[in-house]
Amino acid sequence: MEERSGVLETSRSCKQLIGPEGSDKEFEGYIDSNLRVVETFLRLFPIGLCVTALVIMLKNSQENKYGSVSYTDLGAFRYLVHANGICAGYSLFSAIFVALPRLSSVHIAWTFFVLDQVLTYIILSAGAASAEVLYLAEKGNMATAWSSACRSFGPFCHKVTASTTITFVVVVFYVLLSLISSYKLFSKYDAPTVSNPSMGADIVAFHG
């Protein structure tokens, strides 16, 4: 009887040890699954926004008695079109890739981390450049004797405002995506190591 009771106690203790680990794994799987769903939608939403901003700017031209103006006349607006096109393509590709289950490795995590950062800065710089040009078109510049162009080309400026505003909304989405890709990389994988031949050992590249 004592031997049997000892076996039962041992099995119970094993279950107690295994139980929390199993529940932790289930919880981590639940978090990863929900995070993948959220990330997929965050990558899908910018597609429509980028395409909308791109189309608005592409069709933006005006001609009246004062002359004619088109988005192609200004480099900042051309940059905005290209940036939104790149953003739409990358968002679609990355959303499809993220939605696929069990495709995760340190190389993939690093790739998404870097690309998300790059896209964030590309979209941000495109929006900032367009906003600066729009400000000059709206307010003019007394120091250089530039008058307000938007007084003569109001509809053109309104479309620029709409396209630029949508672009900044896309920036918000990509800031969130950058945070998610950073979390997925640095919470799951160790810091990269750099070989040091003189010491004959590997050194962690990040110092905490």
UniProtKB/Swiss-Prot annotation:
Stored Pfam families: CASP_dom
Instruction: Kindly give the InterPro entries that the UniProt entry links to this protein.
Output: CASP/CASPL, CASP_dom
Which UniProt keywords are present, listed alphabetically? Cell membrane, Membrane, Transmembrane, Transmembrane helix
Q: Where in the cell is it found?
A: Cell membrane
Give the UniProt entry's GO cellular component terms. plasma membrane
Q: Which residues lie on this side of the membrane: Cytoplasmic?
A: 1-36, 101-107, 181-208
**What sections of the protein cross the membrane?**
37-57, 80-100, 108-128, 160-180
Regarding the membrane, this protein is recorded as: Multi-pass membrane protein
Q: Which domain of life is it from?
A: Eukaryota
Q: Which residues lie on this side of the membrane: Extracellular?
A: 58-79, 129-159
Principal subcellular localization? membrane
Its subunit composition reads: Homodimer and heterodimers.
Concerning its family, UniProt says:
Belongs to the Casparian strip membrane proteins (CASP) family.
The protein's name is CASP-like protein 2A1
